[in-house]
Design a protein with these regions (language model features):
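Class I S-adenosyl-L-methionine-dependent methyltransferase catalytic core
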Residues: 1-160
Length: 160
């Protein structure tokens, strides 16, 4: 697992030891960032269910203005801090329950939602993003889930 491009290009990120996580593969991450590459610079990023922090770190490396990393696991939060320091990047790291964080945070231009599979957290997080109006106008939400999962329905003006 590495940073694909930007100021931290090529830096290897520490992976979890014994944590119940499945970091996004470099190939998937590269494809995802190729799709949004012109929508990153200067943006405010939220990496919810951060795990290793690799999605927010990739965004910072590519010029995002700021990033907030949220995870309830103490080990994950420490791993995000370690990876940020290793990449010489700065971000706000929050240890806490993701859905609770969404009730009190400000707006973001780019939101990464990569919760544990088969927990129902993706649908709940999307509902909270809509309910609490967290996505800035023109913003993007990137969700990761099983391929077989049916895409959630969102009210206007949101679309998938």
């Amino acid at each position: 697992m590495r940073v694909i491009t930007g100021t931290a290009r090529g830096r290897k990120l520490r992976e979890p030891e014994g944590m119940a996580s499945r970091p996004t593969t470099d190939n998937v991450k590269e494809s995802m960032f190729n799709l949004i590459q012109f929508d990153i610079e200067g943006r405010r990023v939220l990496d919810l269910f951060a795990g290793t922090g690799q999605l927010g770190i990739e965004a910072l490396s590519r010029g995002a203005r700021s990033a907030v990393f949220v995870d309830e696991s103490r080990a994950a939060v420490q791993l995000v801090r370690t990876n940020l320091a290793h990449c010489r990047l700065q971000g706000d790291v929050v240890q806490g329950e993701a859905l609770g964080y969404l009730r009190t945070c400000g707006k973001f231009d780019l939101i990464f939602l990569d919760p544990p599979y088969d927990t129902g957290l993706l649908d709940k997080a999307l509902a909270n993003v809509v309910q609490f109006d967290i996505l800035a106008e023109g913003g993007i939400i990137v969700c990761e889930s099983r391929r077989e999962k049916e895409r959630p329905q969102l009210p206007q003006p949101y679309y998938l």
